[in-house]
Amino acid sequence: MNIDGKRVLITGGSSGIGLATAHALALRGARLLVTGRRSGLVDAAVDALRATGADVYGVAADVATEDGRAMTMAAATRYLGGLDILMNNAGAVRAGRLEEIQEDEIRTMIEVDLVAPIMLARAALPMLKAEGGGMIVNVSSSIALVALPFYATYAAVKAGLASFGESLRRELNGDGVHVLTVYPSGTDTPMMATNTAGADVGFSLESAAAVAAAILDGIEREAIAVVRGGPDRQAMIDLNRDDPRAVDARFLSIKAAFEQGVRPHKAL
């Protein structure tokens, strides 16, 4: 896909991977609408993007709500006149033992990470189909490929998003709309700020800019998937497929330290 002139909606576009991708797309000539729940962050993101010459608008909206999604889609029509690319990037996470996580926290992850992308894709499809060359980019997680302990709900919703994208891609094959699924590994973003797990338990972080560059490449190639994490992550994915008990044993050996590191992880 040639990105120049494309109209792109990025949810969760005021920070992290979303903002980094907005910068990368702007350099390719895309027109942008970025969303986020916090108006101050959205305004700051828009100012930073416009300072580089980007054609960008922002809207403060909670895509986990019906009203927030309606506001977002109305803004896409008002500011961009339609859509060529929908990037479902907004995310929420709460780590810890399942019985210690509150029901409202579980529901928030389900609503933000799974329900919102499905509903936004549904709402955007008429616009994407009208252009005859649209794309949906769903930001899942490498945890959808190898489910980590103490992330049961987050792993479930991210795996659900990946399966949603796979099914929808096949449904839309031949209809002019492509679906790309992105699987970031650990990324240095505000969402990861409360995760204290380190390299001793296998956590390492790459920059949001590196992930954004990979997403940009995936969009241009109309790739099916972008998987981050390098050879070590791919080896873990392969092992999890071929010998899941070996992965069970590996996590058991670091379970106490792993739990201590990820237990504070919360971004809702």
Segments and roles (model prediction):
Residues 39, 60-73, 103:
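The beta1-alpha1 cofactor-binding region of Rossmann-like NAD(H)/NADP(H)-dependent oxidoreductases
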Residues 14-16, 38:
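Conserved glycine-rich cofactor-binding loop
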Residues 28-45:
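Conserved glycine-rich Rossmann-like NAD(P)H-binding loop of the short-chain dehydrogenase/reductase
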Residues 121, 157:
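Active-site helix of classical SDR
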